[in-house]
Amino acid sequence: MGNIIRVFGFAALIFFTTHLCVADSNQQDRYEAAPGLIDLRSTLSDGAHTIEELVQMARSRGFKILFINDHDRIAISYGVPPFRKILRYKKEFPSIMTNRPEKFLEEISRISEKYPDVIIIPGCETSAYYYWTGSWFKKDLTVHEYDRKILIMNFDNPDDYNLIPNLHNKLSFKYTKKLLPGVIIFIVPLIIGFIFLKWQWGFSPFMGMLLIIFSILAIINYNPFRSSLFNPYAGHQGIAPYQEVIDYVNQRGGLCFWNYLEQMSGIRKYGPINVNTPPYPQVLYQSRNYTGFAAIYGDNITATDPGKEWDRVLNEYCRGERARPAWGISTADFHEDGRAGEKLGYYPTTFLLKEFSRKGVLEAMEKGRMYCSRGDSRVWPRLDSFNVFGKDGRKAFMGETLTTSHFPIIKFKVSYNNEKQTPATLLLIRGGMLIHTFKGETPMEVEYVDRAAPPGEMTYYRLMDTRKHLTSNPIFVTYSETFEKCPLLPD
């Protein structure tokens, strides 16, 4: 009798869960695919076009979602000891901070009202940290990691920008409590200086004045009100300065993405200075709680190859070692239409939206319901559909999780938005392993049953083409044989 009750209870649970999932699937069928452009610069930093010109160009090419990511700051400085922050040379270029964040946000608000059919989301690109080695006199002065870039989305308040914890931002009280004890080492000689000054004996007034001046300069140089805990003369600091920025973005309700992980221009000469930013795909697994990274951009990328850094992060998420996965986007590094032969629209990210609104776009971005493409501003590869199904019709979209008692069924359709037949080779990746290669011409429609899916553990499926012009985000799946092998169910 007890076994019968357990069987009926288990069956009811299956029915109830299936009912909910099918209902949710019907809701998901109403997703709207909308291409957007990320990583755009305007004349408010180092771009050639105004924000309004960017909107007009994008609309004319079929894009109505724009992320404006001007530089928060473009600055670098080098100081000489003992007061490196006072005796320094600093070079700074136009940015959000030099133009004022208020002006940047007001301009986006004005253009958004003028073009209500376009969603414009403000943000920035930041260089969180850099450090120096070498010597100006030995002609080997080198700045490291300056080109490690983080894209920030959805910053709506001027203070969001004012308080970004990078090396050159405004004064902040965030770390004052932690830094204030360090001032004591300079307070002691300051007090001694006043004592010497009061004695008025021999060289004591002169020594007292020197101590006072030195101590005051040392306190200013130490600066317990600085925006970041780090300084550019302390050498390599690992992932910590970047994690500091990521944590800050999360606290402010923004989204953040690693950008240009393997750019080839990170090692170069800038006047008499060496710039040294080697490829840094390792930051994907070194850092935590970021939203994602640039999976397609105008340079080299290997982190998306099967079994590489992205898959390492996704597998850590599947094993419960990470709180969140990392999503891929396309980023443009767009400054001027036609520069280096590239135009606005070469790197679209297509979002699957519940509603065409700013809220809908940010929700899709945060949850990974999007895919990345590379094209020519008018034509690009399109992922018309990509789902994993259970046998009973339940399905999951990119960024979602499916639990099924049957072998997962992967279905996808790839085409080009000009509808022309184009040769394509698609890679289906499960858990970091290439499990099948599909060759043909677009439109290409595929159904594949994964009979080798690992039972009892979470994994994921993702797609990419061999040209790296199309990359999906993952769909997570747990395949469980429990239902089929339950000893209480009748044969």
Regions found by a protein language model. Give the residues of each.
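C-terminal functional module detector
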Residues: 2-6, 23-33, 45, 51-55, ...
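Bacterial N-terminal signal peptides
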Residues: 8-19
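A metal-dependent hydrolase metal-coordination microenvironment
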Residues: 26-259, 266-267, 286-288, 295-316, ...
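Short low-complexity, flexible loop/linker segments enriched in glycine and/or proline
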Residues: 80-84, 136-137, 271-275, 279, ...
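Extracytoplasmic/periplasmic/luminal assembly and interaction segments
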Residues: 258-280
